[in-house]
A protein has these predicted regions:
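ATP-binding glycine-rich phosphate-binding loop
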Residues: 22-38
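Juxta-kinase regulatory segment immediately upstream of eukaryotic protein kinase catalytic domains
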Residues: 1-21
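The N-lobe alphaC helix and its flanking beta3-alphaC-beta4 segment of protein kinase-like domains
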Residues: 70-74
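ATP-dependent phospho-/nucleotidyl transfer catalytic cores
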Residues: 55, 61-65, 120-138, 151-222
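Conserved small/polar residues in nucleotide/adenosyl-binding loops
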Residues: 225-231
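Active-site beta-strand termini and strand-to-loop segments that position acidic
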Residues: 39-44
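Conserved hydrophobic/aromatic beta-strand scaffold that supports enzyme active sites
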Residues: 36-38, 116, 219
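ATP-binding pocket architecture of kinase catalytic cores
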Residues: 50-68, 80-154
């Protein structure tokens, strides 16, 4: 995708339901798929609030409308569960800021898709685990997410990236890549390739269990934006 222009960003900002006066906007985070910006607004008597504005990568996610339908469906479900459990839905799940037309996304004049979320303050994200405690807390969060969504109708989610979690298809593509060896690098990783090929049966087991209806569909943090993933 082409770099985001100042004009594009201004257009997107003008088409979301923001309150207050914009005092700052700048690129944010270390993500490499979508283009993310932090916006800071000044609101009388409330001080400054932060929101996230993001241009969605339609190359990586070719069905952005379905992506946002998945997100709004799951986050709405989560909010109800979090409130029932006495939690704080402003901090414990994403909160989508709608566009001025009420949709959870905006399409700019160039055809790019944008979305916006409330910024979660006093929170940290990590590209790499720095200590065991961080890994533990991520597992706790993952488990809590799974628990809250255990009765979510996962079959209602759109599969916006075809066969993304189909391990049989992934393995077939891997073997095809090894055979073609377009870049001539297979010989340098023969040990690693052999390690993977010897475990093809393991790679297929979840898909086969799903085919036999032995494994229910579930939503996961890495997949609810675009598809369902079989997991216990």
């Amino acid at each position: 995708m082409n770099p985001v222009t100042r004009e594009q960003r201004d257009e997107a900002i003008a088409h979301f339901k923001y309150e207050g006066t914009l005092v700052k906007d700048c690129p944010y985070g270390s993500g490499h798929i979508n283009d993310t910006f932090l916006l800071i607004f000044e609101i009388a008597e409330m001080g400054r609030i932060k929101v996230i504005l993001q241009r969605m990568n339609s190359t990586a996610f070719p069905k952005p409308v379905e992506v946002m339908e998945n997100i709004t469906g799951v986050t709405s479900f989560l909010k109800k569960k979090i409130i029932e459990n006495g939690g704080d839905p402003e901090r414990e799940t994403l909160n989508v800021i709608p566009a001025v037309d009420g949709k959870p996304y905006y399409i700019d004049s160039t055809g790019d898709y944008w979305r916006s979320y409330k910024f979660i303050t006093d929170a940290s994200t990590y590209d790499l685990v720095e200590k065991p405690e961080q890994f533990y807390e991520s597992a706790v969060a993952f488990g809590n997410f799974q628990s809250l969504l255990s009765d979510y109708p996962a079959e209602t989610l759109h599969e916006t990236i075809e066969k993304f979690h189909d391990t049989r298809n992934r393995f077939a593509l891997f073997k095809k890549s090894v055979e073609e060896d377009v870049m001539g690098r297979a010989a340098s990783v023969e040990k690693e390739i052999r390690f993977v090929l010897e475990r093809e049966e393991i790679a297929n087991c979840f898909a086969e269990m799903l085919d036999r209806h032995e494994l229910p569909l579930r939503v996961t943090p890495v997949s609810y934006t675009h598809l369902t993933l079989p997991t216990k």
